[in-house]
Every structure is written in C-alpha cells, then in structure tokens.
C-alpha cells in the first residue's frame, strides 16, 4: 500500500488500507512501538478520508481506523455510514461499522449490521471478522453460549485470531464452563503474552464502562490476571 501511495499520492483506498494494517497489528498485539504506530495509523486514516470523500473503500477502512486508533467512534461511524450510502453492497462497511457500534455500546444495531454482512457475502474471505464481531456483540448482550459458539467459528477460520480467543475464554467462564475457558486463556497467553485485564482499555476502544467491566470479569474468571 505504501508503494501504491508513492506512485499515486492521492490514492485514497491505499491510505485507508495502510491505516487499517495498523488496526490489525494493534488488535493482534503485534505493535512494537504502540504510540508511534497508532499515530501513523491515524495520519494515514485522515489522509484516506481527505482524499476519498466519495470512495467507499477509503471511508470504510479510514473510518474504522479512526474509530479504533483515535477512539473517535462517532466520527468513524459517520464515515462508514457515508460509505454505505455510496456502496450498500460493500460488505466490509457493514461489518466494520458493526464493530464500531459494538464498541459504542449499540449491540442490537451492531448485530443487524453484522448479520447483513454475512448474508451479503457468505463466502467472504473476512468471514472470521464477521463471526468475531457477532461473538463480541453477543458477549456484551450477555448471551454467553452464543458468544462462545461464534468465537469458536471465528477461530475455526483463523486460529490465531486474538479477539476470538479472548471472547471464547470470557464467554465460557461466565457461562460456568471453566475447562474450555482455561483452554482459551492459554491460547490468549500464547498469542499475546502482554494482554491482561489492566490493558483491555488500551487494546479495544470500548466506550461503556459496564462492557469493559464485563470483559474483565470474564477473563478474570477464566484465569487471566
């Protein structure tokens, strides 16, 4: 993507995709210099939006990156809503918009967006993201059995998906199943040894205190310090 930007400094979608790479690094615990990488992701996301006011791809990836990295959930949601007006058949806008609404505390509307994305693109190569999003929404809604099931589906498609392992662990724990909860916590420790209850607020831009507390409670019950 950086090479594409070098060749075309106004290539909005390339800025958005490059920004989104920083989101992916953050959610998987891969960042080496978190403040610098977050700042660079924000910079790229803002360029995506500035260059791509009529580009659904740029608005989707850039908007989601701003919601996640800059924690501007309202702004990110508005940008993705514009992307959906431009291209209502763009599945990533549906599921990434769903993620931002989850973080904003709008689990019901998030579920509607994510479910639509699944129907719109049932063989999507990013299906694991949709499944993880549904798992997260179900978890914050208190539907722990459904959350665990969807998290395990996501892990079936991408076994190294950190958020899938986290939600599986917390869901099983709060549903009273300690053995699978411990199994998934062990996977969390392998995927990101630095993740702990105290770092959850930095890891995901969860807006509502009760949602953050629920996730911390589940992971504590699963055995994560």
Model-derived segments and their meaning:
Residues 169, 181, 215:
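Hydrophobic, well-ordered secondary-structure elements that form the walls
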Residues 14, 123, 194-195, 225:
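A general structural signal for well-ordered secondary-structure junctions
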